[in-house]
């Protein structure tokens, strides 16, 4: 499912999969890489709880060892819409059975995207 937020002639499109920004359009011009599987099919992933890769693919925290894919668990797991209006959307992801396979901790991750004029912010 895709969510579109707008401000005048400008808009952003975001997906529930990883709360990823899929499109950033200002006055009819697309400003975000649209993906090409020949090079890189992704766009603007949310990296949580890490960015990049772990040394040897492993980490230990609070006595728990885990292995984690590049850029963490958020980008490969779905989010839900927590709040939405014309120019903003807040996504939420809670730890679950899938995320705990790689990141064995409870969490709640909220990400809010807002478009105002020609500016998109995320918190």
Feature roles, as predicted:
Residues 1-121:
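Surface-exposed acidic/polar loop and edge beta-strand patches at domain peripheries
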